[in-house]
Amino acid sequence: MNTEASQDKTVSMTTGERLRQAREQLGLSQQAVAERLCLKMSTVRDIEEDNLSADLASTFVRGYIRSYAKLVRLPEDELLPMLAKQAPLKVAKVAPMQSFSLGKRRKKRDGWLMSFTWLIVFVVVGLTGAWWWQNHKAQQEEIVTMADQSSAQLSQNNEGQSVPLTDSNADNSAPLADNGSTPVDTGVAPQQSQTPAVSGSATAQQPAVVSPSQTTLPETTPAAPTAPLPTADAGVTAPAVDPNALVMEFSADCWLQVSDANGKTLYSGSQKSGGKLSLAGTAPYKLTIGAPAAVQIQYQGKPVDLSRFVKSNRVARLTVAAQ
């Protein structure tokens, strides 16, 4: 009778109660069990009170109970079937609510995270677009300003060059008038010298009339063709032999400004596609180019590298000097 009563009592006990009873029979405390099983004391307490968390996987629960049973010398075959009967009831009551709340919190957290991520993306895109627009606008304003300055300089240069042009024309017209009047005077002078010669002695005046005509004709004829030839040849060949010439070829319309070491503006204006420009001055040259991709520059037979300006798509400001 006592045996049957003890068996009924054992069957009615839960897994945690049987483990606690076996621990007390061996005289072990919960702290000692926790240290031997490398578990927290709260976990040992939850196992004995059958109050394991629903978040804990069943594999870990079975492992804890199996280790606890070996420690207190209880057969595992008796405890695990009892655990299978107890666990579904608790899990069925608690797990759905906890999983629902966890899923809801996770979705809420993911929603905030996605919103924050999209906000950062929009801010980065907006700042990038604003930065690009400011640079583009600044470049356009700079090109317009340089074009206005070049047009103003060209108008000033044209006004300054108008006076020398009129002076040169006046100077050119003056020698022409003198050259035209000289043969007239020489032609009249012999006639005036001949009239008194007829009234006097004709024989004495004849050599004087012939000698001026013979002496003036050789002087005037060679002077006209020989004088302009050296100046014309020198004006054509002088720029071609300048070693400091700056040669530029244009593949598209481009605005540029070039000045030499003395601060003299050699060129300021626009060039069309297919144009070629050769400038000579005192090195180093200072260049400002509105469209670096549209021009190829050679100096002393070597190309000038403009790739850094082409890649950044900005106005080129550089100094070209002898290497």
Swiss-Prot record:
<dbReference type="GO" id="GO:0003677">
    <property type="term" value="F:DNA binding"/>
</dbReference>
<feature type="compositionally biased region" description="Polar residues">
    <location>
        <begin position="149"/>
        <end position="172"/>
    </location>
</feature>
<feature type="compositionally biased region" description="Polar residues">
    <location>
        <begin position="179"/>
        <end position="214"/>
    </location>
</feature>
<comment type="similarity">
    <text>Belongs to the RodZ family.</text>
</comment>
<protein>
    <recommendedName>
        <fullName>Cytoskeleton protein RodZ</fullName>
    </recommendedName>
</protein>
<dbReference type="InterPro" id="IPR023690">
    <property type="entry name" value="RodZ"/>
</dbReference>
<feature type="topological domain" description="Cytoplasmic">
    <location>
        <begin position="1"/>
        <end position="111"/>
    </location>
</feature>
<dbReference type="Pfam" id="PF13464">
    <property type="entry name" value="RodZ_C"/>
</dbReference>
<keyword id="KW-1133">Transmembrane helix</keyword>
<keyword id="KW-0238">DNA-binding</keyword>
<dbReference type="GO" id="GO:0008360">
    <property type="term" value="P:regulation of cell shape"/>
</dbReference>
<comment type="function">
    <text>Cytoskeletal protein that is involved in cell-shape control through regulation of the length of the long axis.</text>
</comment>
<dbReference type="InterPro" id="IPR001387">
    <property type="entry name" value="Cro/C1-type_HTH"/>
</dbReference>
<keyword id="KW-0472">Membrane</keyword>
<dbReference type="Pfam" id="PF13413">
    <property type="entry name" value="HTH_25"/>
</dbReference>
<dbReference type="InterPro" id="IPR010982">
    <property type="entry name" value="Lambda_DNA-bd_dom_sf"/>
</dbReference>
<keyword id="KW-1003">Cell membrane</keyword>
<dbReference type="InterPro" id="IPR025194">
    <property type="entry name" value="RodZ-like_C"/>
</dbReference>
<keyword id="KW-0997">Cell inner membrane</keyword>
<feature type="region of interest" description="Disordered">
    <location>
        <begin position="149"/>
        <end position="236"/>
    </location>
</feature>
<dbReference type="InterPro" id="IPR050400">
    <property type="entry name" value="Bact_Cytoskel_RodZ"/>
</dbReference>
<keyword id="KW-0735">Signal-anchor</keyword>
<keyword id="KW-0133">Cell shape</keyword>
<keyword id="KW-0812">Transmembrane</keyword>
<feature type="domain" description="HTH cro/C1-type">
    <location>
        <begin position="19"/>
        <end position="71"/>
    </location>
</feature>
<feature type="topological domain" description="Periplasmic">
    <location>
        <begin position="133"/>
        <end position="323"/>
    </location>
</feature>
<feature type="transmembrane region" description="Helical; Signal-anchor for type II membrane protein">
    <location>
        <begin position="112"/>
        <end position="132"/>
    </location>
</feature>
<dbReference type="GO" id="GO:0005886">
    <property type="term" value="C:plasma membrane"/>
</dbReference>
<feature type="compositionally biased region" description="Low complexity">
    <location>
        <begin position="215"/>
        <end position="234"/>
    </location>
</feature>
<feature type="DNA-binding region" description="H-T-H motif">
    <location>
        <begin position="30"/>
        <end position="49"/>
    </location>
</feature>
